[in-house]
Regions:
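General structural feature for long, well-ordered alpha-helical segments within catalytic domains
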Residues: 2, 17-21, 34-41, 70-76, ...
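Phosphate/pyrophosphate-binding loops at sites that engage ATP/ADP/AMP, CoA/4′-phosphopantetheine
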Residues: 111-114, 273-283
Length: 283
């Protein structure tokens, strides 16, 4: 995003000032940087037009490295998460809660397998051999792989059907044998923090994930400063979803005594550790 926005700007204006660079990059939201180095680099880009900066041969610092997947990416032949499954691979479809909060019970899941050709397995919490929890941050892991008896949010997973691709594709999730009982939901922080609100997790008193300390200086002295500008109001930011460039998909297969996964992820080592804990196997 940064490169595309900067390239578009430099194509129109080879020597932009800081305000112009900020304006051009303003639509690129990035949590990984303070923007300062990027802004400076775009403003200085014209200095390298005549003679590109090249590292000395054999220099460890500054030497340009070829990306392992660079050629495949450029040619469009690289394989993404939804491209790696071979012919005949089994496919999984997750059954999710249609309610914000509900209790549920399963019906005749064994009968579903008998009457639905191509389905070979139904997975529920009882099939989890290890820890029925997952989450990116180890200290706050509390999300079940499959909910047990009650779901806590709309879309929470309760089961998965596994089978050949055609059967799973045609399977209507409304045919899954489950009975739902919708329960009162608390959809705002204020309601969830109320004294009479039920606990989302038994180990989270008051429905509070964690407490922290924010330190600040002398607010009154700051406001009293002659150069201080005070702005008051209610400010709301919208929800921003990452713009994935591929489906969230992947492949898992057994290779010897190892489980090998090909998935799209930002945190492969955390995924590895989580999967090992869920399956009750060594990393």
């Amino acid at each position: 995003g940064m490169l595309m926005a900067a390239t578009a700007l430099l194509a129109e204006n080879a020597r932009p000032d800081e305000a112009q660079v900020k304006d051009a990059l303003g639509g690129v939201l990035c949590r990984c940087t303070g923007y300062r180095k990027i802004i400076q680099a775009v403003m200085a880009a014209h200095d390298f037009d005549a003679e590109p900066l090249r590292a000395e041969t054999g220099s460890a610092v500054g030497t340009r490295l070829n990306r392992l997947d660079g050629e495949e990416k450029v040619l469009g032949t690289d394989l993404f998460g939804d491209d790696v499954a071979g012919q005949g691979a089994l496919v999984l479809k997750v059954i999710r809660s249609p309610y914000h909060r509900a209790s549920f019970s399963f019906g005749d899941t064994g009968g579903l397998l008998v009457t639905t050709p191509g389905l070979i397995k139904i997975l529920t919490a009882s099939d989890i051999p290890g820890r029925n929890l997952h989450g990116v941050i180890p200290d706050t892991v509390d999300q079940p792989v499959f909910a047990v008896a009650e779901t806590r949010f709309k879309g929470e997973a309760i089961a998965a059907v596994v089978g050949d691709a055609d059967a799973v594709d045609k399977f209507d999730v409304s045919d899954f044998p489950v009975t739902w009982t919708e329960r009162p939901a608390y959809l705002t922080p204020e309601k969830a923090l109320a004294d009479n609100a039920p606990l989302i997790h038994a180990n989270r008193p008051g429905n509070i994930l964690m407490n922290g300390i924010v330190q600040r200086g002398d607010l009154a002295a700051g406001f009293a400063h002659k150069d201080a500008t005070i702005a008051e109001g209610d400010f709301i930011t919208g929800f921003v979803e990452h713009g994935y460039i591929e489906p969230e998909a992947g492949l898992a297969q057994r290779v010897g005594d190892r489980l090998e996964m090909h998935v799209c992820t930002q945190s492969p080592y955390m995924d590895r550790d989580d999967t090992a804990a869920i399956l009750g196997i060594a990393k």
